[in-house]
A protein has these predicted regions:
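NAD(P)H-binding glycine-rich loop region in Rossmannoid oxidoreductase-like domains
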Residues: 5, 31, 37-101, 116
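Short, glycine/charged-rich beta-strand-loop motifs at protein surfaces that mediate ligand recognition
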Residues: 152, 170-179
Length: 196
């Protein structure tokens, strides 16, 4: 039977790369998408579930049968400063609760460098780092097997990745740096094979 891993935020810049990297190692990604999201051509053949993540029943159905979930959702910059609260805290919490209900026991969460920091310029966007930390805490307390990835300075660069060095540290060890989104995606796939 094929391995299936759900990816929420699969149409985003990091999310679609996570799905592509899953395909590269023979895992079938189940793309969890907003109704209006576009999917890159490389993922058109993948299973797609369009839903509002606030709909608990739809979320449970979307996750049922998956062996794991990679959460790559994130609030987009907007004049609506409640986005980070709705997406990065409550939306993450809702996905975790759904995993508990349908027995998806492994979760990888893409968060952000400096999550939880109050005095940081990114917090001008709806206290995003504070809300991301609340989402992380929900996962930490869930009883599920989990990994939180906190990348910073995400770049779109796709060349020279084989010459990159990824520095893995514990929480709050790095203040700044940059990493290509493709390498974050690979870290997510690697994390699926590593129990917390």
């Amino acid at each position: 039977m094929a391995r299936v891993v759900a990816v929420s935020g699969a149409s985003g810049k990091t999310g679609y790369r996570i799905a592509e990297e899953l395909l590269a190692v023979g895992i079938h990604p189940r793309l969890l998408l907003r109704f209006e999201s576009a999917v890159p051509p490389s993922l058109m053949h993948c299973e797609q579930v369009r839903l509002n993540i606030e709909n608990v029943d739809a979320l449970d159905q979307a996750l049922a049968g998956a062996e794991a979930l990679v959460i790559a959702t994130g609030a987009r910059p907007s004049v609506d400063l409640s986005g980070p609260m709705r997406v990065d805290a409550w939306g993450v919490k809702r996905q975790i609760e759904s995993c508990q209900r349908v027995n998806v026991n492994r979760v990888v969460l893409v968060s952000s460098l400096c999550a939880g920091r109050w005095l940081h310029p990114l917090n001008l966007f709806g206290l995003i780092l504070v809300w991301k930390r609340i989402g992380e805490r929900a996962l930490e307390r869930s009883g599920l097997s989990w990994t939180v990835i906190r990348p910073g300075g995400l770049s779109e660069r796709e060349s020279g990745l084989d010459r990159e060095v990824i520095r893995l540290t514990g929480p709050d060890q790095q203040e700044s740096d940059s990493i290509p989104r493709r390498l974050v995606a690979r870290c997510c796939v690697d994390a699926l094979e590593t129990q917390s």
